[in-house]
Amino acid sequence: MKKIALLSSTIAFGLFEPEHRDARTFSYEKVASTADLSHFTLDYALLLQALTDQHCLPTLVAWNDPHIDWRAFDAVLIHSPWDYYEHQDAFLNVLRDIETHTVVLNSWKTVAWNSDKKYLQDLSDAGIPIIPSAFINVAKTPDILAALPNYNWTQGYVFKPTVSAGASNVFVITSSEQAAKIYTQYFLNKHNTLLVQPFMEEIRTEGEWSLIFFEGHYSHGVLKKAEAENIWVKHSMENQKHLPDESLIKASVAIYQRLIALRQDSPLYTRIDVIKRIEGLCVMEVEQIEPYLYLHAKADAAKKLVAGIIKRL
């Protein structure tokens, strides 16, 4: 039986009962029924089920637990280390150390690149379409207003650190006064680089698509929308009725292939978030660390992911 560590964090542990952290006492039905239909927890259950079906023993472990013997695992799957961005250097050092003992998926090389949103500049330089993005060196920019790109205040500016995850320190700015206040309070002397982007109204109208790839092949896609007056996109059962059409899949595959050519890498999993604009698809983000993979959105998605893990052992 192959032992698979699911790399997590103590933050994520709160979502799971202790008996669900080790597949030896795992019950898919119990997790699914007590998960309050949380997509994340349901996907965790699907992953555990797929692993155990293939005679693997998955165990949830904290990335910064000093007592873990990584040699005891046949592979380490990065799963839910939600606090990694607060300890980027330490997290990457741990991954580099783990790779000397066992297989890490995705690899340190992939994660190191993807952990800083300055990767968007690499994509743009390679001709991959991204939404407009400006990177501001905080240490050299005491006055944010003098450095802001010429976006539309009515549309709004999005401020976020380049090393971040989820909604942490993400703001929509609609005035110069707000920009100066937020920059001083949340970014100055606290972060190295500020990412500034225009707010994309498409996430409220048509929505944002997440396209998921396993082992170099397109698997499935889901539509997410932000509610009115909100900037956070989410996948709902209503949105699940919408499937990407062939033209969207074809365009996303082309973006993925250009990404792989750029990186000369072979990640196990990749999620590409895009919006549709008049000029075509634009990349919002590429997720290769601990993305939510929407395994519940396609019947064989978890099986495909696990097949990729086993292939690399």
Predicted regions and their residues:
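ATP-dependent carboxylate activation and anion-phosphoryl transfer catalytic cores
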Residues: 247-313
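Short hydrophobic segments within beta-strands
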Residues: 7-9, 79, 214
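Phosphate-binding site of ATP-dependent enzymes
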Residues: 171-262, 275, 281-282
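Short secondary-structure junctions
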Residues: 56, 128-129, 153, 261-268
